[in-house]
């Protein structure tokens, strides 16, 4: 077993060796530009790009013509949310989303608010899931877009997307789904789930970083305004020379996910449960955040009461985990996702996200259980609050003295 141990699979995944092998020729011998139509180098590159497009489409039950290559899921989210809002704004300027979305969606929504759009930010239930009835109640005659993720990047909680998609479809509203954390881990089908736009990332499913895709429905056709102008690549949706090696890698990653996903999900879920039960045996006052029933296989988001998450992360340097999402864990604010779910500020501050995946082992899980057990106990020994709770004191009943 190699130290440090990687348990942050929601932030990124290692590139699968089979993916790397598929990519290598496109750096060295097959280096053509896929847009070069006049010679064999370009044709070879285009052929590889189209084969990868087929694989990504197959993974989500779409047609290859509905896959648009991007530089990653942040760009896909921006193109979907802003592109749809700008195209349909004559019909209305009201958008609906959830407070626990990824920052790429939330910040796109805030940018649109500054342009005069009105956004309804819905609160999830205590278990992290969004109630479809709330979406239905939020729709208005001028609503043009609903954007709800499939699986949350912090809690791994899976929303009832098919139901939300059906509500949007019946109301004639475009439905965007950020499916970055679910595609390749659990089934995702654009037809069964009534999805019009879906964001996909390669590096969250053992592909390379810096490449992603946006699914754009053709029947009934969904229209977007391009957010990037240039040579009109990708049917005008997204100009820019295609990253051929990255796209080939994403195609291979999609193929492997399609073939191995179900068996992998069983193995990774077993590892997650081993981790959860092990931590629960080692420690008291431990809270799992979000629904365990509706959750992606490798996610465990846990709050260790009376321990500061950042202090714990420093104490367990041998295990790579995160507090909050990788995109925002640089800020010391407690997780906005957990706060929106109604988790107290103290518990949100003490939360750790474990992400297990394809290359995680039982040995690594057992090591993490021992290490976290030891370090949490040590940090709690220094916490007067923990001592008081153990002595049966109800902290809510205490009148704290004002320090001023």
From Swiss-Prot:
InterPro entries: Aminotrans_V_dom (IPR000192), Aminotrans_V_PyrdxlP_BS (IPR020578), Cys_deSase_IscS (IPR010240), Cysteine_dSase (IPR016454), PyrdxlP-dep_Trfase (IPR015424), PyrdxlP-dep_Trfase_major (IPR015421), PyrdxlP-dep_Trfase_small (IPR015422). One of its GO terms (biological process) is [2Fe-2S] cluster assembly. Pyridoxal 5'-phosphate binds at residues 73-74, 153, 181, 201-203, 241. Pathway: Cofactor biosynthesis; iron-sulfur cluster biosynthesis. One of its GO terms (cellular component) is L-cysteine desulfurase complex. [2Fe-2S] cluster binds at residue 327. The active site is at 327 (cysteine persulfide intermediate). Belongs to the class-V pyridoxal-phosphate-dependent aminotransferase family. NifS/IscS subfamily. Master enzyme that delivers sulfur to a number of partners involved in Fe-S cluster assembly, tRNA modification or cofactor biosynthesis. Catalyzes the removal of elemental sulfur atoms from cysteine to produce alanine. Functions as a sulfur delivery protein for Fe-S cluster synthesis onto IscU, an Fe-S scaffold assembly protein, as well as other S acceptor proteins. This is Cysteine desulfurase IscS. It comes from Anaeromyxobacter dehalogenans (strain 2CP-C).
């Amino acid at each position: 077993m190699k130290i440090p141990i990687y348990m942050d699979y929601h932030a990124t995944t290692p590139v699968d060796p089979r993916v790397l092998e598929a990519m290598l020729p496109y750096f060295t011998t097959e280096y053509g530009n896929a847009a070069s139509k006049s010679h064999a180098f370009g044709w070879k590159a285009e052929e590889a790009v189209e084969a990868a497009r087929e694989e990504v489409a197959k993974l989500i039950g779409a047609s290859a013509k509905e896959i648009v290559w991007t530089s990653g899921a942040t760009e896909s989210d921006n193109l979907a949310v802003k592109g749809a809002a700008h195209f349909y704004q004559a019909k209305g300027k009201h958008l609906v989303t959830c407070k626990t979305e990824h920052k790429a969606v939330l910040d796109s929504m805030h940018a649109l608010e500054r342009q005069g759009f009105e956004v309804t930010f819905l609160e999830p239930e205590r278990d992290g899931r969004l109630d479809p009835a709330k979406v239905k109640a939020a729709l208005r005659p001028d609503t043009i877009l609903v954007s709800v993720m499939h699986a949350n990047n912090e809690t791994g909680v899976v929303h009832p997307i098919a139901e939300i998609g059906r509500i949007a479809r019946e109301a004639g509203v475009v439905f965007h789904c950020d499916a970055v954390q679910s595609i390749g881990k659990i089934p995702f089908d654009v037809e069964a789930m009534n999805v019009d736009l879906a964001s996909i990332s390669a590096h969250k499913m053992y592909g390379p970083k810096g490449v992603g895709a946006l699914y754009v429905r053709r029947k009934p056709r969904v229209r977007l305004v391009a957010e990037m102008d240039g040579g009109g690549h990708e049917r005008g949706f997204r100009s820019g020379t295609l990253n051929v090696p990255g796209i080939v890698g994403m195609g291979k990653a999609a193929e492997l996910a399609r073939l191995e996903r179900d068996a992998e999900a069983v193995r990774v879920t077993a590892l997650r449960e081993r981790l959860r039960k092990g931590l629960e045996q080692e420690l008291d006052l431990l809270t799992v955040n979000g629904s365990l029933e509706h959750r992606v296989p490798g996610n465990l988001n846990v709050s260790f009461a009376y321990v500061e998450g950042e202090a714990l992360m420093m104490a367990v340097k041998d295990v790579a985990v995160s507090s909050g999402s990788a995109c925002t864990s640089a800020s010391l604010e407690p997780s906005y996702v957990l706060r929106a779910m109604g988790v107290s500020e103290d518990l949100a501050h003490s939360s750790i996200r474990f992400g297990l995946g394809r290359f995680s082992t039982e040995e690594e899980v057992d090591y993490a259980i021992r290490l976290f057990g030891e370090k949490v106990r040590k940090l709690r020994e220094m916490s007067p609050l923990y001592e008081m709770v153990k002595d049966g004191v109800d902290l809510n009943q205490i009148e704290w003295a004002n320090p001023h």
